[in-house]
Curated annotation (Swiss-Prot):
Residue pairs linked by disulfide bridges in the UniProt entry: C75-C323, C732-C787
Sugar attachment sites: N63, N249, N257, N363, N401, N406
Locations listed in the record: Cell membrane; Endoplasmic reticulum membrane; Postsynaptic cell membrane; Postsynaptic density membrane
The protein, known as: Glutamate receptor 1
Predominant cellular place of this UniProt entry's protein: membrane
Low complexity: bias regions: 863-872
Designated gene of the protein: GRIA1
Other noteworthy facts: The postsynaptic actions of L-glutamate are mediated by a variety of receptors that are named according to their selective agonists. This receptor binds AMPA (quisqualate) > L-glutamate > kainate.
PTM-bearing positions, type Phosphoserine: S645, S710, S849, S863
Keywords attached to this entry: Cell membrane, Cell projection, Disulfide bond, Endoplasmic reticulum, Endosome, Glycoprotein, Ion channel, Ion transport, Ligand-gated ion channel, Lipoprotein, Membrane, Palmitate, Phosphoprotein, Postsynaptic cell membrane, Receptor, Signal, Synapse, Transmembrane, Transmembrane helix, Transport
Family per record: Belongs to the glutamate-gated ion channel (TC 1.A.10.1) family. GRIA1 subfamily.
Positions of S-palmitoyl cysteine lipidation: C603, C829
Segments crossing the lipid bilayer: 537-557, 610-630, 806-826
């Protein structure tokens, strides 16, 4: 029951509060002129409201510059019970209005110029302009200009400009023209002409601005070289017809984009509305203040509808309040209305309508418009997040493909291999046919896709483009575009920030980075024993120790294992046989077995015991892995001749002083090092700018020649694409080392706001998608290369081994053969000496002993007696020592007869 009771109570209270919300909301209006376009916009906006509550206007026509009259009308409307007031103010009355609004908690919605106030009850419909103005001045790189302003608008914009000028060292001459007469204008512009001041900012309302521009035309200060920035949100509200053919540039801001869907729809409804109330409206160019007025009415309607949905009671009961009471009594419901107004957000005539906690517009967009001799066009837009964003020429520029096609454009470029080169027989051709190269073909493809005629012209100073730090003037191809001497630049022109500020670039047609060029070092010849390189010397030592260790272990296990011993039978006499235990794995046979297994040649003996076979098996496995690994690496080590480079990276350059290094004297590479904040590059820049003699060169060709003649003592820093190209040209003595120091791209450049920018950009993207850009690079870099290797089309070729690669193997073979001959000779001498000594002893024994020896020598070689008396052989069994055949005929003297006795005679 308690829950049901609470539910009904809540519903009842909500119904009571909802019922108390007024169906009619009184709103005030303070206008300077009943016939003004703003007044008509106010009434039209009210007529378009259909949802409750209904807004009932209390409109007063007032002199907005008269503080007394403004106070009287404001208090009069407040006493009549208005919930909010819409109106205008001027510099003389703004402080009074903000003071009353803050004291009485009455919301004042205004399209007048923004003021810097903390009063949250003043809702400012007009966006602030100072940040956008500073962005445009910075965009044009103005360092010295005149600021003409109207003091009636307040000084907030001027103050912001002066503060920024102090930070950026701008030279600003501020001129107040509030009371300037026609003669004053003449003297003003004469004085500016004497000082060569042709860059002017004009900060005035539209009415006064039209008068100033009229004086500019009358005094003929609208010729080529003059540039005016209009600090006004209604560029399209101003009559600029007489500026179209004058040659002067005029830049300004447009708050309302009447080509958008919502503004176009509202303007059509307004045009078709009651002609009796809106006959004085200029439908061709409605003013931006009228659009702000329309949005202001909608802001109030949205706020009161929100309060109604929330069932917030804002009804004014009893006394409506005394405006001049002392002390002032604030209206209790004013806070609720103020919060509701600041929370409104919608898409209106002036774009996104939204307010911050101070009642100022936020998240808005301003369109930047420029007028030159060829018409009006949008050059970009500005918002609080992105600041100024340049845009390609759109429909407002009045430029189209037909205008592009109806003239011959000047394409500036630079002689640089392989981008632009004179043909060998260039004197036999004329015009563009004299040149060949990557950029020559690229320019032809771009012209074919865009559909224009062009003429190639080589830049006179032979430079890419940099700004002089003293005169601030641009040279090279960038200067040609900035000063209107060329229409397009098709060259290896790097896209950089400082260049992008004064010219426009297409999407990159080639990606690259700064690289290091050095003279190619001599290839290192392989050593005599380079066949040992696949394995480290530590591994070879371990293999030797493993070989000896395995041989010793095999010898030991063969001795200890009873299964390694076996019996051999032999005849001792005609009717008697004898058996003996033998073991084939003595120490030398063990070494021989291990060596044969390691060389994968095998041996005529094998282990018989399980322990011996385990030793042999693990040794075979070991040699299998080692030999396989060695063989896998041997080919690479024998066929590759390494070049030992003195440097491998920028870090190596920075930490040494023996090798000098430099860049192009005027170009993006030098600018990169000058602006870099990376420690290594800062160190390199410090060295380069102070090196003696200078390490900078005027052209890339000069840098290449310096590298080749320096004998490895100079490194040249340049774009990787050019480095790769030079590496493919004879005499093939330069090379690129290390990776790229940065990442950037080459782009096709056009003047700021050129009608060619968008078509050229689309053409570059299309050529990239078709693969033509890669095809052109392969053609001019690698297909025409002179060093036999290069791009992706090059095929790997197997290098033939030279004698130096395998000389060590032959040395070992020859050494082994010589060692074998030497060992054989030593064995022969040793054996001969041993037998000679033995025979001398044999000749001295008695005849009976000789006969006995002869008798025993006729027995089989391996007799039991011989085995017991002779030493053990290699395989551990007894052997008899027979006389060599050469010794069997040696004569001996008998003691009894003194006659020589030969063995054959016995």
């Amino acid at each position: 029951m308690q829950h049901i009771f609470a539910f009904f109570c809540t519903g009842f209270l909500g119904a009571v509060v909802g019922a108390n919300f007024p169906n009619n909301i009184q709103i005030g209006g303070l206008f300077p002129n009943q016939q003004s376009q703003e007044h008509a916009a106010f009434r039209f906006a009210l007529s378009q409201l259909t949802e409750p509550p209904k807004l009932l206007p209390q409109i007063d026509i007032v002199n907005i510059s008269d503080s007394f009259e403004m106070t009287y009308r404001f208090c009069s409307q407040f006493s009549k019970g208005v919930y909010a007031i819409f109106g205008f103010y001027e510099r003389r009355t703004v402080n009074m209005l903000t003071s009353f609004c803050g004291a009485l908690h009455v919301c004042f919605i205004t399209p007048s110029f923004p003021v810097d106030t903390s009063n949250q009850f003043v809702l400012q419909l007009r966006p602030e302009l100072q940040d956008a103005l500073i962005s445009i001045i910075d965009h044009y790189k103005w360092q010295k200009f005149v600021y003409i302003y109207d003091a009636d608008r307040g000084l907030s914009v001027l103050q912001k400009v002066l503060d920024t000028a102090a930070e950026k060292n701008w030279q600003v001459t501020a001129v107040n023209i509030l009371t300037t007469t026609e003669e004053g204008y003449r003297m003003l512009f004469q004085d500016l002409e004497k000082k060569k001041e042709r860059l002017v900012v004009v900060d005035c309302e539209s009415e006064r601005l039209n008068a100033i521009l009229g004086q500019i035309i009358k005094l003929e200060k609208n010729g080529i070289g003059y540039h005016y920035i209009l600090a006004n949100l209604g560029f399209m509200d101003i009559d600029l017809n007489k500026f179209k053919e004058s040659g002067a540039n005029v830049t300004g801001f447009q708050l309302v984009n009447y080509t958008d869907t919502i503004p176009a729809k509202i303007m059509q409804q307004w045009k078709n509305s009651d002609a009796r109330d809106h006959t004085r409206v200029d439908w061709k160019r409605p003013k931006y203040t009228s659009a702000l007025t329309y949005d202001g009415v909608k802001v109030m309607a949205e706020a009161f509808q929100s309060l109604r949905r929330q069932r917030i009671d804002i009804s004014r009961r009893g006394n409506a309040g005394d405006c001049l009471a002392n002390p002032a009594v604030p209206w209790g419901q004013g806070i609720d209305i103020q919060r509701a107004l600041q929370q409104v957000r919608f898409e209106g005539l002036t774009g996104n309508v939204q307010f911050n906690e101070k009642g100022r517009r936020t998240n808005y967009t301003l369109h930047v418009i420029e007028m030159k001799h060829d018409g009006i066009r949008k050059i970009g837009y500005w918002n609080e997040d992105d600041k100024f964003v340049p845009a390609a020429t759109d429909a407002q520029a009045g430029g189209d493909n037909s205008s592009v096609q109806n003239r011959t454009y000047i394409v500036t470029t630079i002689l640089e291999d392989p981008y632009v080169m004179l043909k060998k027989n260039a004197n036999q051709f004329e015009g563009n046919d004299r040149y060949e190269g990557y950029c020559v073909e690229l320019a032809a493809e771009i012209a074919k896709h865009v559909g224009y005629s062009y003429r190639l012209e080589i830049v006179s100073d032979g430079k890419y483009g940099a700004r002089d730090p003293d005169t601030k003037a641009w040279n090279g191809m960038v200067g040609e575009l900035v000063y209107g001497r060329a229409d397009v630049a098709v060259a290896p022109l790097t896209i950089t920030l400082v260049r992008e500020e004064v010219i426009d670039f297409s999407k990159p047609f080639m990606s690259l980075g700064i690289s290091i060029m050095i003279k190619k070092p001599q290839k290192s010849k392989p050593g005599v024993f380079s066949f040992l390189d696949p394995l480290a010397y530590e591994i070879w030592m371990c293999i030797v120790f493993a070989y000896i260790g395995v041989s010793v272990v095999l010898f030991l296990v063969s001795r200890f294992s009873p299964y390694e011993w076996h019996s051999e039978e032999f005849e001792e006499g005609r009717d008697q046989t004898t058996s003996d235990q033998s073991n084939e794995f003595g120490i030398f046979n063990s070494l021989w077995f291990s060596l044969g297994a390691f060389m994968q040649q095998g041996c005529d003996i094998s282990p018989r015991s399980l322990s011996g076979r385990i030793v042999g098996g693990v040794w075979w496995f070991f040699t299998l892995i080692i030999i396989s690994s060695y063989t896998a690496n041997l080919a690479a080590f024998l066929t590759v001749e390494r070049m030992v480079s003195p440097i491998e990276s920028a870090e190596d350059l920075a930490k040494q002083t023996e090798i000098a290094y430099g860049t192009l004297e005027a170009g993006s590479t030098k600018e990169f090092f000058r602006r870099s904040k990376i420690a290594v590059f800062e160190k390199m820049w410090t060295y380069m700018k102070s090196a003696e003699p200078s390490v900078f060169v005027r052209t890339t060709e000069e840098g290449m020649i310096r590298v080749r003649k320096s004998k490895g003592k100079y490194a040249y820093l340049l774009e990787s694409t050019m480095n790769e190209y030079i590496e493919q040209r004879k005499p093939c003595d330069t090379m690129k080392v290390g990776g790229n120091l940065d990442s950037k791209g080459y782009g096709i450049a056009t003047p700021k706001g050129s009608a060619l920018r968008n078509p050229v950009n689309l053409a570059v993207l299309k050529l990239n998608e078709q693969g033509l850009l890669d095809k052109l690079k392969n053609k001019w870099w690698y297909d025409k290369g002179e060093c036999g290797s290069g791009g992706g089309d090059s095929k790997d070729k197997t290098s033939a081994l030279s004698l130096s690669n395998v000389a060590g193997v032959f040395y070992i073979l020859i050494g082994g053969l010589g060692l074998a001959m030497l060992v054989a000779l030593i064995e022969f001498c040793y054996k001969s000496r041993s037998e000679s000594k033995r025979m001398k002893g044999f000749c001295l024994i008695p005849q009976q002993s000789i006969n006995e020896a002869i008798r025993t020598s006729t027995l089989p070689r391996n007799s039991g007696a011989g085995a017991s008396s002779a030493g053990s052989g290699e395989n551990g069994r007894v052997v008899s020592h027979d006389f060599p055949k050469s010794m069997q005929s040696i004569p001996c003297m008998s003691h009894s007869s003194g006659m020589p006795l030969g063995a054959t005679g016995l």
